[in-house]
């Protein structure tokens, strides 16, 4: 033993041990450094990143839909309001088998194939952890049945929502419009406008009328709640809530009672009536018949119901007051007279003898007057009172289409009126350039003549006729027709402000009074074409009627409504205002093909009596269309 120990080199072994220990220590130190560096990177450098990831798994933002603003009429009557409805919703991430769950729900809440198809479509475009509607507008029985069976459906729940409701149905559809489910086009538009985030919890959006035009005002600001969820996606607790901001309530210039009254008068007719206050431009009534119930669209109209509306020959989907285009006919004669006087084409003393026709100079072409035997010697006033066509044929010929189109454009024809509805057409005020572009033909002198009496290529909407009438009433001062009266903001009413537009012509020329006096004669003097309707009124009315031909008559052919198909009969138009010396109301009316009941003058008188006298009589006599055709010009 002693011999073996004498050969061991303890110094070398000690040095080797020290080296190994040093290497091990350095290795441990290096590994510890790497660990510390990684801990530093995780805890310090990337702390925010990992905290965010953790919170994204743990914390969810749940959007809260704002309450949509209420729409009121001028007297504070709600025209569009919100009602609580219940719908069943599913969060697919919380459901083990979506299809089995849907099948099981069929017997519980009467789920249909259409409901399931709508759910799948909505799911395809929704974000994760979004609650998706499965069936809307549940009945009390369906809610109760689900409550009893809820334990069978984790991830499915019934929620209450505010749903739009229109209590007056078809009476206001073409004005108020409606909201309906947000579709792909809406999503694309909202995204392009940078507004999509504000609709995270909203299912409906304004599609038509006031609901569409003032969507940004009515919708409000979406809120949200911050909640903590577990690994199964179930909410553990609420961390924070930012309440939504309700949309603003708005008040319209409309008078609901007047709107309903006029709709009753027009029942059965294809017609439109616009009633305004010429002092402000506020629209008191805007009626288009036939109409339809907007509530059909709120929950999503069925294909059958929509096809019925779309294929209805009476076109109830069209707002005739703003989208219907018709020859304005003789209703424009007062404006043509003011234009010709202002342009120096005629004077107050200009006269013309009317034998019952007017002949185009240098041609054998004759243009007939509605009165076969003629009106005799005419001046400006008498030509308006008797609605003499020949006088205005001559005026149109002398003015020429360029000046005539320019002046009628000042009265708003051929342009949008500015009314706060997106559903509006501009009609057509013909020009040389328009005809060349449309028909690839030049403008002939013969084209100008019928324009002088509101015929030919000229088309206009009832709202344009209303705006032109207000310009005349106000001696050339322009009032833009509008439906918004005020918006409720912070407990205050913020009124709508009339935009400034340059006046038409010289407001002090006196020509306006001359034209209005002619309209006064139409309604009050024995030779006036509408004398029989208005002369007996206890207040003074000024009016101008018109007849728009749907098809042309042959030479020497007499119009007989009884021998013509209903759809080919003349349209009947009328504009009027009252009281004459201090106008408070202006009315424009169109009865397609003469309407289905009383004559246009009878209806106009009844509307004015209702406004001025409170007369609510709607039991009016039906009139012979052939007789009415001979009287309304």
From Swiss-Prot:
UniProt keyword annotations, A-Z: Carboxypeptidase, Cell inner membrane, Cell membrane, Cell shape, Cell wall biogenesis/degradation, Hydrolase, Membrane, Peptidoglycan synthesis, Protease, Transmembrane, Transmembrane helix
Pfam families: PBP_dimer (PF03717), Transpeptidase (PF00905)
Enzyme class label: hydrolase
Activity-regulation annotation: Inhibited by mecillinam and benzylpenicillin. Inhibited by diazabicyclooctane (DBO)-based avibactam and CPD4, with IC(50) values of 0.59 uM and 0.01 uM, respectively.
MF GO annotations: penicillin binding; peptidoglycan L,D-transpeptidase activity; serine-type D-Ala-D-Ala carboxypeptidase activity
GO-annotated cellular components: outer membrane-bounded periplasmic space; plasma membrane
Keyword Hydrolase: yes
Transmembrane regions: 22-42
Ranges in the topological domain labelled Periplasmic: 43-633
InterPro entries: Bact_Transpept/Beta-Lactamase (IPR050515), Beta-lactam/transpept-like (IPR012338), PBP_dimer (IPR005311), PBP_dimer_sf (IPR036138), PCN-bd_Tpept (IPR001460), Penicillin-binding_protein_2 (IPR017790)
Domain of life: Bacteria
Regions of this protein lying in the Cytoplasmic compartment: 1-21
Functional pathway: Cell wall biogenesis; peptidoglycan biosynthesis
Catalytic site: 330
PANTHER family listed in its UniProt record: PEPTIDOGLYCAN D,D-TRANSPEPTIDASE, PEPTIDOGLYCAN D,D-TRANSPEPTIDASE MRDA
Name listed for the protein in its UniProt record: Peptidoglycan D,D-transpeptidase MrdA
Organism of origin: Escherichia coli (strain K12)
